[in-house]
Amino acid sequence: MEPSKVKKEKNGNASELTAILRARQKVELVKVPLFVEMVEEALENNMSVVVFCNFTETIEALSQRLNTKCIVNGEAKYAKARQQNIDDFQADKQRIILVNIQAGGAGLSLHDLNGNHPRMSLISPSYSAVLMRQATGRVWRDSAKSKSIQKIVFVAKTVEEKVCDSVKLKLENMDLLNDGDLTT
């Protein structure tokens, strides 16, 4: 549904969408301690970690808890540092990078260039199959010097179960269209 149509609807759809958005924000914040634990474990295993989030508040909480300013975000306050943060991560000067999935899902290469620190991506789910597919492609490249691990982190019994079902169906449909196998 287009945003302009949402505003015009008077049957409560806009408030329902807002409620879903707020629920997703809360659930993503609940995952901060889990993300911190997963990042710390990956660092102990000599990996570098990309954390993809949907909401600025989550990125700020992770930045504080993980003591990192290495952020790729669509906000103006991070614009100057964006390329430097990417370069520092790629050069293994920074081992953690926090990425807003909307701002860094496409056109961003974060794979292992040096062979020193394999990559792990932790992805907080988005309703957008395109953004999810793009996020999974940021740490994996044919030219990578090591294998990557990617984890999509959903929280059971929350709004994210619907996100999971929705994005799974969308990804399957994308694969059918892209693979050209519409007969099965």
Description of each model-found segment:
Residues M1-M47, C53-E57, A61-R65, K170-T184:
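Interdomain linker/hinge connecting the two RecA-like lobes of the SF2 helicase core
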Residues L17, R24, E75-A76, V163:
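Helix-centric, low-specificity signal for extended rod-like, repetitive segments
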Residues V36-E40, S63, I86, T136, ...:
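Short amphipathic alpha-helical segments and helix-helix/interface helices
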Residues N46-S48, Q94-R95:
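Pre-Walker A (Motif I) flank of P-loop NTPase domains
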Residues V51-F52, V153:
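Active-site-adjacent beta-strand anchor residues
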Residues I59, C70-K162, K170:
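Conserved RecA-like P-loop NTPase helicase motor core
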Residues V167:
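C-terminal anion-handling pockets and recognition modules
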